[in-house]
UniProtKB/Swiss-Prot annotation:
It holds the Pfam family X. The lineage of its organism: Viruses, Riboviria, Pararnavirae, Artverviricota, Revtraviricetes. Belongs to the orthohepadnavirus protein X family. GO terms for biological process: DNA-templated transcription; symbiont-mediated activation of host NF-kappaB cascade; symbiont-mediated arrest of host cell cycle during G2/M transition; viral genome replication. This is Protein X. GO terms for cellular component: host cell mitochondrion; host cell nucleus. It comes from the Viruses. InterPro entries: Transactivation_prot_X. HAMAP family: HBV_X. Residues 68-117 are annotated as: Mitochondrial targeting sequence.
Length: 154
């Protein structure tokens, strides 16, 4: 069973953030504020980095009690096709990092909710989840598969 994460948008930074959903929440997303995101230059990860969780392909900071670094990520299977992915998602995300016009934040949020979490949480396909850090996170991946080139298709 995959670890449950809450996906939240940080409009100030225009990034998606992952936060672990605690057992006390019974699977519901956090109702509190987004909280303080760690600085991309920070390399310290608290001891409770969540190595006991069964999730693969996420940086260790994703399980930090202080919250993960800002992440942009996608689902590997969706990257391999243009079906259900507006304008090929990796290119869209790259344009956004350069400040160019691309998919709206609302469209991105809908994409991740519909494509990522449906397949990941409901179907249990967490092994296929890939994380692409486009903004300075230097943490190592947990149980990382072979390196993946962000700009090439599988």
């Amino acid at each position: 069973m995959a670890a449950r994460l809450c996906c939240q948008l940080d409009p100030a930074r225009d990034v998606l953030c992952l936060r672990p959903v605690g057992a006390e929440s019974r699977g519901r997303p956090f109702s509190g504020p987004l909280g303080t995101l760690p600085s991309p230059s920070s390399s310290a990860v608290p001891a409770d980095h969540g190595a006991h969780l069964s999730l693969r392909g996420l940086p260790v900071c994703a399980f930090s009690s202080a919250g993960p670094c800002a992440l942009r990520f996608t689902f590997a299977r969706r990257m391999e096709t243009t079906v259900n992915a507006h304008q090929v998602l990796p290119k869209v995300l790259h344009k956004r990092t350069l400040g160019l016009s691309a998919m709206s934040t609302t469209d991105l949020e809908a994409y991740f909710k519909d494509c990522v979490f449906k397949d990941w949480e409901e179907l249990g396909e967490e092994i296929r989840l890939k994380v692409f850090v486009l903004g300075g996170c230097r943490h190592k991946l947990v149980c990382s598969p072979a390196p993946c080139n962000f700009f090439t298709s599988a």
